[in-house]
């Protein structure tokens, strides 16, 4: 059984009542039919063909001195899709992996691979050779596109596969440089030269066909293979650009890795609206400010840790106020209100979004209300830090009791699990039926996030299930403790985890990175007192460790590493 068929193995997952079949609802409506005239499988690859005509000469993509129009991007993707099928033998359902940062070629592969009928699998560019080898074996990738700077890691990964008698994928280099003349590898530009722009796109026969596989970020140390459908990617792409007001004149800076949730589906969304893409390989405050001024960037996305870097960077003082409106979409963890406040003081418009790899990225956003402008800053930014309402393409989002599946009271206090139901939820975990069934138990996707629902219907996260500290029988939200820590003038970054305790079971342990210049001015006792003055005493950290925090490639703090460190400390009592 090939990959495509295996991905489509039917699974009985949801115990909720299924919708009635069309024949039942149409009994009294004679003359209605579903046919190719009124039902075409949804796929985001259709956006590119339209943009090549509607925005033909508009700039589609910029990377340093490289610049393409939408007509050129469409032409290149057709030729690449042709070469994938005729030169490299890609068949429908074959997996094509990438191992690279945000280069123009990765953007093009988001179209070319599904145009050839393949399934795109973008691997985290920070993975080591052992992880790359594991993911290539699991996904059964037939090809892997690699940028030159990561070639040695990729080679080592392929060697590991060969040692296990697993056929490694064909490696294609993302370069036309003369310094890489080895005949051992195909080159991206050679493929383009051998492709034909007369290629007939392999459109999905079913909109539920897989378009991509995304491995979860690794904050749990065990990545899972999340499968996106053409339908889900199509709907999420359109919803995201509409919610954030992106149009033909918008300029999107690629600060979110395309290997993370397919870049929140923005490769396809930008094409839908004919927006301009600015690619950068490495993210830094300087790169962000430079591109805002050079290319008049209007939108970019970033984790709260990246926003924290921006507000604490010297570039922030040099380049603000901004010359024009720039919207920042932030997600990945609850943003500290203080960071949102500082970003907006600098001239950024912060839009808080929330989602998971399993929801194609964005699944909710905090819609700001005009009446919030009249509130005191502290209250206003606290409201903006909430996760908000369901995304435009997500039919339902709720906080429910995970046992009874009843919706919790909208009182801002009753904690339940955040759950989703909609067309942008993943198809499932590839090769992990048990995990898929657990995630969909009860007819909803269970996020694993704990939250509350306020009177206005807005949802607010309190913690991940696995991150809650249980001390003396009391549940402590690490998010609430971290919010207080971020309000300290000397704290650059903070994360709270559980430390084992013989008397209390667990106690809060805070890992803190101090701002430059404060290293010798702040002690652990001072941090603890600061928290005790602002929180119930049982919630205040009992341990404070000063060090740099480990992060994923998207800037999310890897709490599992900190938990291991706290566990190794042993009991405080």
Swiss-Prot record:
Free-text tissue specificity from the UniProt record: Restricted to glandular trichomes (lupulin glands).
Enzyme class, first EC level, given as a word: ligase
Localization terms from the record: Cytoplasm, Cytosol
Region SBD1, annotated ranges: 284-352
Catalytic activity: 3-methylbutanoate + ATP + CoA = 3-methylbutanoyl-CoA + AMP + diphosphate; butanoate + ATP + CoA = butanoyl-CoA + AMP + diphosphate; hexanoate + ATP + CoA = hexanoyl-CoA + AMP + diphosphate; pentanoate + ATP + CoA = pentanoyl-CoA + AMP + diphosphate
Record bears the keyword Isomerase: no
InterPro entries, per database record: AMP-bd_C, AMP-bd_C_sf, AMP-dep_synth/lig_dom, ANL_N_sf
Signal sequence region: none
Region named SBD2: 353-429
Keywords linked to the UniProt accession: ATP-binding, Cytoplasm, Ligase, Nucleotide-binding
EC number: 6.2.1.-
Entries under SUPFAM superfamilies matching the protein: Acetyl-CoA synthetase-like (SSF56801)
GO molecular function: ATP binding; CoA-ligase activity; medium-chain fatty acid-CoA ligase activity
PANTHER family given in the database record: ACYL-ACTIVATING ENZYME, ISOVALERATE--COA LIGASE AAE2
Full protein name: Isovalerate--CoA ligase CCL2
Provenance organism: Humulus lupulus (European hop)
